[in-house]
A protein has these predicted regions:
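Extracytoplasmic cell-surface/polysaccharide-interacting catalytic and binding patches
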Residues: 2-11, 23-248, 253-366
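Core hydrophobic alpha-helical transmembrane segments of single-pass membrane proteins
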Residues: 15-22
Length: 366
């Protein structure tokens, strides 16, 4: 009898130990979740979904905590929720649900929220998946307020994402001479003047100087820094038996208006716009641009010793060939091997080495 009682006690004791061990295991499991910050109710959902093992080894995710108890939870996105940084913003859970359904991953979504204003995220969720979106957002010259234009231009053209951002920043998603903007500072040496940016009709540079007659076909003026640079360039060209002259430099607003209107009378607006600027949109009014002539006092032509020398050397003096043969779709002007613009040595060298237009440079640096 005593032996039976003893055996019974051993069985009971063993059973109690097993219960304690099981309780300890359950407690540790619960403890692990608690150390990650999840609520007990959330952990219960983890158990029901059989995803505890996925959660235990991961850092606490407030996004997962919030979404798992909402109507926007989808179990197939567990791994994505774990890596999405939570934002205390209206419609956050709905927006990430929509972004995930479109095809964006957690890294994409984090970038989207880091780079965009909340209102603009609706533009993303209202469109199909854009594979280059995060690449666009990470460009230093991406502009939040241009997002809708970027998306439209990207979807309607076959350009890479760098060109899309660049061209929209230039304004090329609009027709030339539409959506025009006044130049912020007319006197800025680096002011961009093109078919989207115009100078005031009253602007006249206050530092115009006359270019030495040794380097000019007639009386021509440039701003002092550009005039000095041109004279240095023309003098150094002489050392290589190359003679170049300033043929048409500063023009006033009224001068340009007169010239352009005459061209329109001859060829019509559409054709005139390909080779002549409308008043206010001419670089000549800046006092930083000049048309260059050869010894016959005619504008230099392509593939001549003068044009070849300038192409290779003008940047050393701060000048760039403004309208090249391959850039008409960007500048809106036909090839002008004679038209050079002063922008300073550093920028001119960068443009020369990278084979880009000044429009592209400004679009990526302002």
């Amino acid at each position: 009898m005593k032996r039976r009682r003893k055996n019974k006690r051993i069985i009971i004791f063993t059973f109690i130990l097993l219960l304690l061990a099981l309780s300890l295991i359950l407690y540790k499991s619960t403890l692990n979740i608690d150390t990650h910050g999840y609520q007990k109710e959330t952990y219960q959902v983890f158990k029901e979904l059989n995803i505890v093992d996925k959660i235990i080894d991961k850092d606490y995710s407030k996004t997962l905590e919030k979404v798992i108890n909402s109507e926007y939870f989808d179990s197939k996105y567990i791994d994505e929720y774990l890596n999405i940084n939570y934002k205390e913003e209206d419609n956050f859970l709905e927006q990430i649900y929509n972004l995930l359904n479109i095809g964006y991953k957690s890294n994409d979504i984090n970038t989207i929220y880091n780079k965009l204003k909340t209102d603009n995220i609706e533009l993303i969720t209202s469109n199909n998946y854009i594979k280059d979106l995060t690449n666009m957002l990470n460009l230093t010259y991406f502009k939040d307020n241009n997002l809708e234009r970027y998306i439209k231009y990207y979807l309607n053209n076959n350009y890479n994402y760098i060109d899309v951002i660049t061209y929209v920043n230039i304004g090329l998603d609009y027709e030339f001479y539409t959506n025009t903007i006044p130049v912020v500072d007319d006197s800025d040496i680096l002011a961009i003047v093109n078919k989207y940016h115009y100078l005031s009709s009253s602007y006249v540079p206050d530092d115009l100087v006359t270019i030495s007659s040794k380097y000019s076909t007639r009386t021509n003026k440039l701003r002092s820094v550009a005039a000095k640079a041109f004279e240095n360039m023309a003098e150094d060209a002489l050392k290589d038996n190359i003679k170049v002259y300033a043929a048409s430099s500063y023009r006033s607003y009224s001068d340009q208006k007169y010239i352009y209107n005459n061209y329109v009378k001859e060829d019509g607006v559409q054709i005139a716009d390909t080779y002549s600027a409308r008043a206010g949109h001419s670089e000549h009014q800046t006092g930083l641009a000049t048309d260059i002539a050869d010894t016959s006092y005619s504008f230099i032509k392509d593939n001549t010793k003068e044009s070849n020398w300038l192409k290779e050397n003008a940047h050393k003096y701060g000048f760039i060939l403004r309208y090249e043969s391959t850039t008409e779709k960007i500048t809106g002007y036909m090839y002008e091997p004679w038209h050079y613009r002063y922008v300073g040595v550093d920028i001119a060298t960068f443009i020369h080495e990278n084979k880009i237009t000044y429009d592209e440079y400004v679009a990526r640096n302002k």
